[in-house]
């Protein structure tokens, strides 16, 4: 069974944790930006069907 030989230093642990947090932050920013562009109708990659509010006569 594989066992680490030495304890990971606190600074290395902090660097890895911050990198992991940064990846999550950028994923959230990208998702929010995409949602904003879809809601404003400026998205070029999604086609949203627009429903009209006119009543049929």
UniProtKB/Swiss-Prot annotation:
Q: Which family does this protein fall into?
A: Belongs to the bacterial ribosomal protein bL32 family.
Compartmental location: Plastid, Chloroplast
What UniProt keywords are attached to this protein's entry? Chloroplast, Plastid, Ribonucleoprotein, Ribosomal protein
InterPro entries documented for this protein: Ribosomal_bL32, Ribosomal_bL32_plant/cyanobact, Ribosomal_zn-bd
Q: What stretches pass through the bilayer?
A: none
Q: Give GO MF terms, alphabetically.
A: structural constituent of ribosome
> This chain belongs to which protein, by name?
Large ribosomal subunit protein bL32c
The UniProt entry's GO CC annotations, sorted and at most eight, read: chloroplast; large ribosomal subunit
- Pfam families per record: Ribosomal_L32p
Q: Does the keyword Chloroplast apply?
A: yes
Q: Which HAMAP family match?
A: Ribosomal_bL32
Query: What SUPFAM superfamilies has UniProt attached to this entry?
Result: Zn-binding ribosomal proteins
Q: Which gene encodes it?
A: rpl32
**Would you say which domain of life the source belongs to?**
Eukaryota
The Gene Ontology biological process terms listed for this entry are: translation
